[in-house]
Amino acid sequence: MNQYFTDRNLGRYDFPEYLRRNGLPVHVHADHFADDAPDEEWIPEVADRGWIILAADKDVLHVPIELAAVMCSSARFLNLIGGHVRAIDLARNFVNTRQKIETFIAEHDAPFIAKVYRPTPVSGVLKGKPGSVALRMDYDGWVRSPRSAGFPRRGES
């Protein structure tokens, strides 16, 4: 079973507890790292542990050092898209979308960054309607992009 790691922007209580109540193993940022730990430091450690990173509305694609941390460490990074919604609503959508998320993870090799969207209309979350999952970037896409300039590739020191 996949284990998940929640970034600090998902909070310590509501989001992880909702996932746990629904049978998902969850590790919370605050239990493993200092609150001010830079993302580029904890991302590789979380990836080494095999945990899937969950974050909310985080634009890691536009922060080169964080993007490199994901791609160079073979992290699996799910960005939960929700705008300005409560963590509990993101958690409900995650649980509703769990089957699609698990399928996506099984079908995509690490590293990757994917977005988990809420259903349309958003009221579907409360009715149990699943959202969707979309790949935003994988390793090959990163290597081809100018965002990888200056960072080592696999097999390079």
PLM features per residue range, with description:
Residues 14, 37-42:
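Short acidic active-site motifs
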Residues 25-39:
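Conserved BB-loop
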Residues 39, 50-66:
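Acidic, metal-binding active-site segment of PIN/NYN-like and related structure-specific nucleases
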Residues 43-44, 68:
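Alpha-helical segments flanking ligand/cofactor-binding loops in enzyme cores
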Residues 30, 56-57, 80-82:
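Short beta->alpha connector loops at strand-helix junctions that form conserved
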Residues 2-3, 12-13, 17-21, 25-27, ...:
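N-terminal intrinsically disordered, cationic/polar leader segments
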Residues 103-157:
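Charged phosphate-binding loop/patch that engages nucleotide di/tri-phosphates or the phosphate backbone
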Residues 61-100:
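Mid-chain, well-packed structural core segment of small domains
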